[in-house]
Amino acid sequence: MSNPDVDLDSIIDRLLEVRGSRPGRQVQLSEDEIRFLCNKAREIFISQPILLELEAPLKICGDIHGQYYDLLRLFEYGGFPPEANYLFLGDYVDRGKQSLEVICLLLAYKIKYPENFFILRGNHECASINRIYGFYDECKRRYNIKLWKTFTDCFNCLPIAAIIDEKIFTMHGGLSPDLNSMDQIQRIMRPTDVPDTGLLCDLLWSDPDKDLTGWGDNDRGVSFTFGPDVVSRFLHKHDMDLVCRAHQVVEDGYEFFSKRQLVTLFSAPNYCGEFDNAGAMMSVDESLLCSFQILKPAEKKQRYGYQGSSQNWHMTPPRKNKTGNSK
């Protein structure tokens, strides 16, 4: 599938050339280049597990939703690959104006640094969803529908979840009442669409609810909500310390749940231009100390550049200490 005429470094350079430009400036890759990114990345996704087992240190990012200049701000702040290892939790496309640049840069980095750069599937990496919420229209306007279908083939092979040093369980959405053993995730065959119910659906769609005990209906009309007791039981059963997920806008870019046993990350500040939220990235160091780097919502007249602040939390104990979370 590799195309000798496509220059990966040139693609990355052009995607990064707009750093410092006024947000909104587009990067128009050729159709052949995008097809190469989709096909080559798809090969790599299939060659790696659907349930990734990763090692710290790494940086974890939540939803991006087509906000390309905010993605560049995240890399400015955390270090452009290969300066740091990254794990993204899905929802790269839809809603924002530059889904194509976002997904092309992420796929290019995946191809360039396959063992250091990881992206999971979100509920928007699914044809029935991104057909409606913007990505299809962006592909059709800037290229053609055939290219959108090429992206769909790639998205259908994305990994679903990742475990960091056996202690941090990450996915886009949340837990599932059907999840008893990690083997169940490993047995999911790719390529696959996202079904309307069941384990894969829940991992991409479910949400925590602090006021709930057990499982409840989800206002989204898909999957479930789950209470703090579900999180505690899950972590105890699997000898883990933390669930890290995305999928919901949170005001500060990150938000704890269930006595810091779960954290929600959202990395698109000023989401859709309608929210005043910050975006956050979580850094996990070798001892599994988690810290947060915050992209503050930009003021209306502010041009490109990150406003950042860092906050550290002893969220998980060192690897060999299994006495529970530090405060």
Swiss-Prot record:
Keywords of the record: Cell cycle, Cell division, Hydrolase, Manganese, Metal-binding, Mitosis, Nucleus, Phosphoprotein, Protein phosphatase
Compositionally biased tracts (Basic residues): 317-327
Protein name listed in UniProt: Serine/threonine-protein phosphatase PP1-1
Effect of R245Q: Cold-sensitive phenotype
Assigned EC number: 3.1.3.16
Family assignment from sequence similarity: Belongs to the PPP phosphatase family. PP-1 subfamily.
PROSITE patterns associated with the record: SER_THR_PHOSPHATASE (PS00125)
Cofactor(s) annotated in UniProt: Mn(2+)
Summary of the function given for this chain in its UniProt record: Essential role in cell cycle control. PP1 is perhaps required for exit from mitosis.
Pfam families from the UniProt entry: Metallophos, STPPase_N
Compartment(s): Nucleus
Higher taxonomy: Eukaryota, Fungi, Dikarya, Ascomycota, Taphrinomycotina
Catalytic activity: O-phospho-L-seryl-[protein] + H2O = L-seryl-[protein] + phosphate; O-phospho-L-threonyl-[protein] + H2O = L-threonyl-[protein] + phosphate
Modification Phosphothreonine, positions: T316
Binding residue positions for Mn(2+) 2: D91, N123, H172, H247
Coiled-coil region list: none
Keyword DNA-binding: no
Highest taxon in the source lineage: Eukaryota
Region feature (Disordered): 305-327
